[in-house]
Each structure stands twice: as structure tokens, then as C-alpha cells.
Amino acid sequence: TDKLIFGKGTRVTVEP
């Protein structure tokens, strides 16, 4: 599970 932080400050959890 990788947490990506975008410039919008939104945390998204992505599971490949």
C-alpha cells in the first residue's frame, strides 16, 4: 500500500 500525497494535499492509498 503506497500513500501518494498530491499538491492538493490529498492522501490516496493505492494498492497495486
UniProtKB/Swiss-Prot annotation:
Keywords: Adaptive immunity, Cell membrane, Immunity, Membrane, Receptor, T cell receptor. GO terms for cellular component: T cell receptor complex. It is found in: Cell membrane. Its main location: membrane. GO terms for biological process: adaptive immune response. It comes from the Eukaryota. Gamma-delta TR is a heterodimer composed of a gamma and delta chain; disulfide-linked. The gamma-delta TR is associated with the transmembrane signaling CD3 coreceptor proteins following the stoichiometry: a single gamma-delta TR heterodimer associates with one CD3D-CD3E heterodimer, one CD3G-CD3E heterodimer and one CD247 homodimer forming a stable octameric structure. Upon activation, gamma-delta TR complex associates with FCER1G to initiate intracellular signaling. J region of the variable domain of T cell receptor (TR) delta chain that participates in the antigen recognition. Gamma-delta TRs recognize a variety of self and foreign non-peptide antigens frequently expressed at the epithelial boundaries between the host and external environment, including endogenous lipids presented by MH-like protein CD1D and phosphoantigens presented by butyrophilin-like molecule BTN3A1. Upon antigen recognition induces rapid, innate-like immune responses involved in pathogen clearance and tissue repair. This is T cell receptor delta joining 1. The gene is TRDJ1.
